[in-house]
Amino acid sequence: MQIAIIGTGNVGATLARGWAAAGHEISLGVRDVRQFKGKSLLEEKNIRAYPVAEAVSKSEVLLLSVPPDVIPAVARNLSGVEEKILIDPSNAFRGRPEGYANGFEALTHLTRCRHLVKAFNNTGYENMAHPAGLDTFVAGDSEQAKTVVKQLAEDLGFAHCYDFGGSDMAPLLEQLGMAWINLALIRGLGRNIALNVIGI
């Protein structure tokens, strides 16, 4: 699958490596290919860097892994994403997009994407690199998009990817991510914890 990733911080880089290792073709959307600082990513098989517009145009799936407060600026410069699968992994921990409650709401209004999903926001990037036995979740109105993202989660090695509901459940899924942040970072349990669904 052709996957574009905008934002190569911890989450974006980790997912890029994981999906590339699973055989997906990863296009990193960057401002300046020549001055891109993540050169180590480009040493990985199946990962290449392109200008943002080119990376997006090549993709079937787009992961927008940038801080929530810059999502509006990035989203306003995206074009041709209405029919792509757009993944929002953001949690508004250190700032919100101006004029919006969260990144998902901003992307809904600014991109008009029909296949927007919330996913990969409920655990730390270290766990995303080694997710065996861990659960993750996806929310959105597009059943097609959720099916694809569930498969992408399995490709990374997650044990399960649960359907969390429609777009109206995206804010609640973000709160689940905030719960992980609270336990891991604020309450001091450490980043190597996970929130799993366990039947009793």
What are these regions (language model features)?
Residues 90-130:
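Rossmann-fold NAD(P)-binding glycine/threonine-rich loop
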Residues 1-39, 45, 50:
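NAD(P)+-binding Rossmann beta1-loop-alpha1 motif at the extreme N-terminus of oxidoreductases
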Residues 46, 50-80, 85, 89-92:
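Rossmann-like NAD(P)-binding element
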Residues 24-27, 37, 97, 159, ...:
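Structural/interface elements that position substrates and couple domains in central-metabolism enzymes
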Residues 6, 135-200:
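Active-site-lining helix/loop region of Rossmann-like oxidoreductase modules
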Residues 23, 58-60, 113, 158:
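Short, well-ordered alpha-helix to beta-strand connector turns
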Residues 38, 58, 80-83, 113, ...:
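A glycine-biased structural micro-motif
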